[in-house]
């Protein structure tokens, strides 16, 4: 994955500015920044929902030429709190998951037995097959989020985009979700994870990208990026970064 000199406009406003970034097939990235720094726009650029202007380029999966967006999206799963709030169609759990085959909100065609089987396999992998026949609207917030993760998996995505996926989850549900991500990473799924909570950066993540005012503030290996000075400057706040049990935690204010 490679982005070169990307300027991205949304509604006439320049959100991303001269952005350069690349990701190899063995890396998982966490993307950190305050609200309004362009994190979600960055994810939509990677997913192909937005395109750069003025000669900016996006290359997916090593392809140097043009590649149909339909092929790109078959290889990318996308989960976000925003998408969850937009999925308002009446549907059972398995139907929501199966809609991932069509990249649609709701089912707009017949589902083959093979497609249905893949949907059930995805739910089983995440341990949520018990939600197969539960109406989506009756699920808890955390259950619905995990259903959408299963939906993103039906294409056997090689890259998973997770845009603040733990927003609104309580601590036990969040930890279950994060443990699922670790499991997926061990199975070979690569991830880009947007957050402003560093405790969500699991051991599987290898690199960190900081966005600030629509630009790359700093990027590199996680061990070099996760420190008090860098995080404080990136978020314009005095923050102490600590590490415990291979996870990072933030506290407001510097240690004296």
Where are these regions (language model features)?
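Conserved ABC ATPase "signature" region
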Residues: 98, 113-131
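Conserved ABC transporter NBD signature motif
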Residues: 55-66
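Helix-to-loop junction immediately C-terminal to a conserved catalytic motif
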Residues: 47
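Conserved ABC ATPase signature
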Residues: 135-139
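Catalytic Walker B motif of ABC-type/P-loop ATPase nucleotide-binding domains
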Residues: 160-163
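H-loop (His-switch) and adjacent beta-strand-loop-beta switch element
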Residues: 208-221
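H-loop/switch region of ABC-family ATPase nucleotide-binding domains
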Residues: 195-196
